[in-house]
Amino acid sequence: MLIWLVELADHFQFFNLFRYITFRTGAALFTSALIVFLFGPAMIASLRIRQGKGQPIRADGPQTHFKKAGTPTMGGLMILAGIVVSSLLWADLSSIYVVSTLLVTLGFGAIGFYDDYLKVTKQSDKGFSGKARLGIEFVIASIAVFFMMQAALSAGAAGSTFGSSVTFPFFKDLMLNLGYFFVLFGGFVIVGAGNSVNLTDGLDGLAIVPVMIASAAFGLIAYLAGNAVFANYLQIHFVPGTGELAVILGAVIGAGLGFLWFNAPPAAIFMGDTGSLALGGLIGTVAVATKHEIVMVIIGGLFVMETLSVIIQVFWFKRTGHRVFLMAPIHHHFEKKGWTESQVVIRFWIIAVILAMVGLSTLKLR
């Protein structure tokens, strides 16, 4: 919204700064962090009163988790407030990529909010029907992908079929045109990203820091992919307009820093599905927009690992009656093996940093 002040630059030279994505990204980060810091305490107090017993604790979980009983959830509301308000202020709202990303973020956040509401009111870990939830997520994601695909096709970026194509790391010219099946592929990527972050969010601070790390990595990717000069130098595909997504990702980092202040152990609040689904969906949408869906598997490798541990556990148990892990997702497995919560969290953060660096290295290895 504030980018429109550039029109006043002839009279007020300061407004020239609003042209630059880097300036607006930094401003979005600061704004979202400030929003969460200022309104976080009041929101936590309100949620604690309204929820009473807070988020239900799994009966079969690690014994150390029972001391967390009574901690309020739905902290994703403060994260979403920071991201959305900051993005509305600093991002270019005429960009279909910005609008699509905010659509997914708010849509997934609403689904997560309803899921959290059911869990809190029923005091059960069984919330929204899994099939119904996935179906609605897929519809929202597919709509966003369709509009982003049309935008890329209309721009004629890197060829007339680029918008409907999948690109591959390490190969600068290799693309697979899926046609309108790309909508299904992109929808799957976004839904998968949302639910992967959701599965990771099981310990204080475990999900939010890797989300910020992935956001920083994809913020750089979005900026480079949206800049013709940098994209040509790195020999990555130029996607006009995606640079604006760096502003939203800056807002994610700021909101994440603000939330971590309250989510640091012992957590005063959990983000809940409200936050984890929204954040994962946001990152997935950026990956689709910038044509780095496969690179997301590397950068978000921690989330992939958590998801695979659940899939393997369920599949093997149904097939043999035995479990591969002591408990899934895998962060609980390490808790059961004797790791303290802080050891699991910090070691997983380290893994997230390493994977982000490996993912970013693919930009040059072509």
From Swiss-Prot:
Its cofactor is Mg(2+). GO terms for biological process: cell division; cell wall organization; peptidoglycan biosynthetic process; regulation of cell shape. One of its GO terms (cellular component) is plasma membrane. It comes from the Bacteria. Keywords: Cell cycle, Cell division, Cell inner membrane, Cell membrane, Cell shape, Cell wall biogenesis/degradation, Magnesium, Membrane, Metal-binding, Peptidoglycan synthesis, Transferase, Transmembrane, Transmembrane helix. Its EC number is 2.7.8.13. It catalyses: UDP-N-acetyl-alpha-D-muramoyl-L-alanyl-gamma-D-glutamyl-meso-2,6-diaminopimeloyl-D-alanyl-D-alanine + di-trans,octa-cis-undecaprenyl phosphate = di-trans,octa-cis-undecaprenyl diphospho-N-acetyl-alpha-D-muramoyl-L-alanyl-D-glutamyl-meso-2,6-diaminopimeloyl-D-alanyl-D-alanine + UMP. One of its GO terms (molecular function) is phospho-N-acetylmuramoyl-pentapeptide-transferase activity. InterPro entries: Glycosyl_transferase_4, PNAcMuramoyl-5peptid_Trfase, PNAcMuramoyl-5peptid_Trfase_CS. Pathway: Cell wall biogenesis; peptidoglycan biosynthesis. It is found in: Cell inner membrane. The chain crosses the membrane at residues 27-47, 71-91, 93-113, 138-158, 174-194, 205-225, 245-265, 268-288, 297-317, 343-363. It is a multi-pass membrane protein. It is an enzyme of class 2 (transferase). Pfam families: Glycos_transf_4, MraY_sig1. Belongs to the glycosyltransferase 4 family. MraY subfamily. Catalyzes the initial step of the lipid cycle reactions in the biosynthesis of the cell wall peptidoglycan: transfers peptidoglycan precursor phospho-MurNAc-pentapeptide from UDP-MurNAc-pentapeptide onto the lipid carrier undecaprenyl phosphate, yielding undecaprenyl-pyrophosphoryl-MurNAc-pentapeptide, known as lipid I. This is Phospho-N-acetylmuramoyl-pentapeptide-transferase.
